[in-house]
Amino acid sequence: MSDTAATTESPTRSPLSEEVARRRTFAIISHPDAGKTTLTEKLLLFGGAINLAGQVKAKGERRNTRSDWMKIERERGISVVTSVMTFEFNDLVFNLLDTPGHEDFSEDTYRTLTAVDSAVMVIDAAKGIEARTRKLFEVCRLRDIPIITFINKMDRESRDTFDLLDEIEKTLALDTTPMTWPVGRGRDFLGTYDVVNGGVRLLEGGGAKTGATEQIDIADLGKRNPNLDVSEVRDELALASEACKPFELAAFREGHLTPVYFGSALRNFGVGDLLEGLGKFAPAPRAQDSDLRRVEAAEPRMSAFVFKIQANMDPNHRDRIAFARLCSGKLSRGMKAKLVRTGKNMSLSSPQFFFAQDRSVADEAFAGDVVGIPNHGTLRIGDTLTEGEDLTFVGVPSFAPEIVRRVRLTDAMKAKKLKEALQQMSEEGVVQVFRPRDGAPALVGVVGPLQLDVLKARLDAEYSLPVEFEISEFSLARWISSDDRKKLDAFVAANNSGIADDVDGDPVFMAKNEFYLGYTRERAEGITFSNVKDVKKKA
């Protein structure tokens, strides 16, 4: 292996640069059930952020995992919203964004990936690369996000280690460098060999133990398990050294290579190695693109963008939190910031750090940190906050829905309340709401049916609004625009029964099917139909 040390930093950095350099903001991506939420728990456990890790679908008195905090998440054992958790380890500040693994929540996940500098890809050792993992990896590749791989569940029956690495290299076109190597698999899994420093760490116990793992020399493995062929382990290591590329920090940071760790998140094994690897190799906050220029993290003036809105995190208070990724500078409690979309200033009087649904006041935060900003509808997804500069961060999109439904309210007297609730849910990004210009009932658009279940459950639990969903005459939605305002107005007038407004008041063409959409598009000269909408600079 080549040198694995992170790049050395200049000794003359400013205090701001020192703080920024301590940050590691990352997401965890995986296919559902690969162990992502369990790994999240154990990273927090190793980071000293919690005392007892929960278990997904836990029994008896074991509590639900910290990251899966919403009622529907606790009931189904899945993540449906992005949780943000901050903890410290080895004098570094980690901002962990736990994303939904289910494909129905891909939009929330995509936006989350705009807010991170690196990602951990969790792979089930028995299943290898799965469809959802591949899709999320492609998003990371588009955004040049470096990937660290954790192959999980090594203590269960699993595929051949070389097969797993070969699949990563061929399926994802990504070089692999094992940083640890499994000794045995399934019931015979004894632990991992530290490829960089030598020595075998043994799998011991389980539960909430995070003490130092026992480490022995590879020559002593035979004494622990007489059935183990130590020479076979040595042969595997020699073959891995020949077959896999040596670790190069630049190749990793550029997204060409992934360091690979093996373990069992459920049994707390391999998690410490992964966390140390994140601290050593994952980049500090990177420069962010705006419509005017690239913004460097160590610039003195604060800037940030909103990538998520979450309402009613505390059911006892109708609160609304905007999650903002700091892109540069330092945020101080009480400072004023310019909301670029409106051109108005707002006071950041009580910014907050989060730990799933728990929160604490953020007196100060630095580039790379994720803070919650309480507000009453002022902030929206994609908004940019600055200390005066008129720039807008780009790349926080909305996607056209794949399912469109009408909302039927069982109690017509609550129509106004439903309108307000849907507005709030759409601003959160839970669903998209389209209001037909001909006065017909509102339509909701989602990526998959599970989103409808979440919407129904939240409307009932948070607003006491029992609803049903009905098939709509429309199945597709496309944002429409034109360089010629008169042409756009004429198109809207001619197709009024199929025009709706989104949450921002932008016009959307609702189509019955693909054929009708294509037919209309061919005849709409000068009109652009888009299935993706990026943030706007001005309202």
Give each language-model segment a name:
Residues M1-A539:
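Structural and coupling elements of P-loop NTPases
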